[in-house]
Amino acid sequence: MVMPKVASATSMPGLLASSFACTNVTGDMDDLKARAFASATATPVNISLPPKDGADGAPKASEQSSINLKAEAASNNSGLRPRADASGKYSAIIEASKEILKQNDRGGYTIPAKGLYPYQWNWDSALVALGWASLDETRAWEELEKLLSAQWNDGMVPHIVFHQPSPTYFPGPEIWGSVESPRGSTGITQPPVAAISVRRLFESAHDKELALKTATELFPKLLAWHRWFYKARDPEGTGLVATLHPWESGMDNSPAWDEALERVPVAKLPPYERRDLGHVNSAMRPRKEEYDRYLTLVYLFRDADYDLKKLYNLSTFRVTDLCTNSILHRANLDLQWLARQIGRDDADQEIATWIARTQVAFNSLYDPAAQIYKCRDQLTGQMIDASTSAGFLPLFARVADTAQAAALAATLERWLKKVRYGVPSCDPTDARFEPLRYWRGPVWAIVNWMITDGLRAYGYDALAETVELHTLELVEQHGIYEYFDPVTGAGAGGSYFSWTAAMCLAWILRP
Ligand SMILES: O=C(O)[C@@H](CO)O[C@H]1O[C@H](CO)[C@@H](O)[C@H](O)[C@@H]1O
């Protein structure tokens, strides 16, 4: 096996180098502390329901609508066919997942997790809608309507919508200083999952009238958002859009961003206090050096009034992200499908042009030697030397040809032999792999859901089944966490996590 080039402490100067380069192989102090923390906090074998009373901004038990979970698990009002639950094998997961969505419901939108993430996040909401579909179709549509109601005039749909104030998250509305959305929002976006969810809800809808009405209303907003991507992030018409902030990628501290982020010169920042570290062990979160740069970019964009042309030209971080581009391409396929269902033939041709261009452009991101797709740094023009779980997402996008798909399946099989649970977010043989640190190693249910969808589309059903069963086992054994250690299975990050719950429902109750 060819070892990828590693960002070692000696190849990166100064303090930053030592903080970006990790030493999971020997196990540094951070890593050991995090493992001890994870095993102390992991929920033991029986999956638990979230506590109903909550500090943390959670609604009081008395404010919750009365819930008869057993009855709901039995009468599935969306009509989705229970997949493997005839034996009741997954009834505890179903029950807990539904309860999590209800407890994280803030009225038309779902927060990802109490305390840690108290607002509406973009791709979280789009994926969570798929979970809501198994409880309440109307509520599933509302999730998407609420997200798209925050759309900016230029078409962008922001990465966070600040519906109500919260002291538990930083940086909040006062730092972003954007007034475009009625309730305030960030000034960047996230991977555009929404059109994919609209198609799925539309296809599985029982209430066809509601589905047609809502999809027809949402369609122009989705089209405007996709147009924004090409105007704002691909002004040269390459077929691949740029990502200007690691938060836009959704895979915030991916090793793929290390070198590009290291080149962002840190501004003189006002003093700040990270609230995430009050909720989660610091060894499971991005490092300070990364946060300083995240904030530097936020202030840079704010000072440019979030003007889309200025941002593209002045951002000191600009990459071609596989996750965003795979999701955008898949979303275009689904948007085109929707255009045909609702009689928007006028949009069909425009979307077809995007699809054709991207289909070809994706080949420039395939690394035949590594047998995986890679991101590109747009400021250096170089392919980024990091194999991450995003490298499998071209399967979800359907842009891989059959030989590329076979190579990806083989790569995935090699990765699975190195860890107990797949899919790790970074190649487990890479020295940058850290099994508990957020997007640098842990398993994420949402990524697994997209990878399994892609594997099945290319006929790798058995491999898809393995990844799906790994995820359900993780949840069953450890709880519905934000992410999981691929080596030990320990749950990490936030607990009672909405999109993990939603993916379980989407898998177990899939139509
Ligand atoms: O760490 C954070 O504060 C936020 C910033 O957007 O990102 C994480 O959390 C968000 C909420 O779950 C996700 O959408 C992102 O992909 C990421 O996992």
Where do the PLM segments sit?
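Low-acidity, Ser/Thr- and Arg-rich intrinsically disordered low-complexity segments
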Residues: K5-S11, S18-T26, R35, S39-T41, ...
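Bacterial Sec-dependent signal peptides at the C-terminal "C-region" and cleavage site
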Residues: A21-D28, A61, A71-A74
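N-terminal polybasic/positive-inside topogenic patches
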Residues: S39-T43, K60, G79
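Extended glycan-interaction surfaces of carbohydrate-active proteins
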Residues: L80-Q120, K146-G184, T238-T320, R357-V443, ...
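Extended, well-ordered alpha-helical scaffold segments
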Residues: K89-S97, D136-S149, K208-F229, A331, ...
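Alpha-helical support elements that line or immediately flank enzyme active sites
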Residues: S125-G155, A390-D401, N448-D461, E468
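Internal, well-ordered domain-core segments that constitute the primary functional module
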Residues: V193-P255
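Long, repeat-rich segments with strong aromatic
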Residues: S315-I342, P442-W449, D453-Y458, A462
